[in-house]
Design a protein with these regions (language model features):
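Short alpha-helical "patches" and their helix-cap loops
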Residues: 57-60, 151-153, 174-175
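Helix-centered, glycine/charged polyanion-binding patches within enzymatic domains
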Residues: 81-82, 87-152
Length: 175
C-alpha cells in the first residue's frame, strides 16, 4: 500500500488571507513541490500497489500528513501489512503506532540523514511513483480544481472525481 496527500486549493494564492469561502473549515497550508502557500484542503489517500484508491480523508490544509495515517489504516483494514510513504511520514511515534497495529511503514530518509544512500532503494521509489501518477490523473478529473462553494458540493465533486478515476482504473484493468 502507498500513502500520500495532495492539496486542493480553494482560491489563488494572492487571495489566501481574503478568502471567505469555507471560512472555519479550510485554512492555509504549504505545497512543498511548488514552494507556495495555498488556502484550502488536503486530501490524504491510501492507494493499492497497482493504483486503486482504497480510502481517503479530507482535512484542513495545515494538517500534517502523518496525523491521518492511523485513521486511514483503521478504516481500510488492508491485508497487506506494508505501507510505503514519503518523507512527510518520518517519525518514531507514527512508526510505533503502526507497528502496534501490525503494519510496517517504510519511508525514505531525507538526503541529510545518515545512511540515506543505502536506505533509499530506487525500486521502492519507483513504486511510490504509482501514487504520484494517480494524483496527476485525479487532476484530469478535476479533483484538485474543485470550484465548489459549499461543503456538500465540495464533497460530492471530490467523490465523483475519485469514483470516475476508480471506474476508469477498473475498466482499464479488466479489459
Amino acid at each position: 500500500l502507498i500513502i500520500d496527500s495532495f492539496p486542493v486549493p480553494v482560491c489563488q494564492p494572492i487571495r489566501n488571507y481574503r478568502a471567505k469561502v469555507f471560512r472555519g473549515y479550510a485554512n492555509i497550508g504549504y505545497k512543498a513541490t511548488k514552494k507556495i502557500y495555498f488556502y484550502g484542503f488536503k486530501v490524504h489517500a491510501i492507494v493499492s500497489d497497482d493504483g486503486y484508491i482504497l480510502d481517503y480523508v479530507v482535512t484542513k490544509a495545515s494538517v500534517h500528513d502523518a496525523r491521518e495515517t492511523v485513521e486511514l489504516m483503521e478504516n481500510t483494514h488492508p491485508s497487506n501489512y506494508y505501507l510505503l510513504g514519503d518523507e512527510g511520514y518520518l517519525g518514531k511515534e507514527l512508526h510505533q503506532q503502526l507497528k502496534q497495529m501490525g503494519y510496517e511503514l517504510w519511508t525514505p530518509y531525507r538526503k541529510n540523514m545518515t545512511g540515506a544512500k543505502k536506505h533509499n532503494d530506487h525500486q521502492l521509489m519507483a513504486i511510490r511513483r504509482t501514487i504520484e501518477s494517480d494524483f496527476s490523473l485525479l487532476t484530469y478529473y478535476n479533483a484538485e480544481n474543485n470550484r465548489a462553494r459549499s461543503l456538500i458540493g465540495f464533497q460530492s465533486r471530490l467523490e465523483i472525481a475519485i469514483l470516475a478515476y476508480n471506474l476508469a482504473y477498473c475498466l482499464e484493468r479488466f479489459n
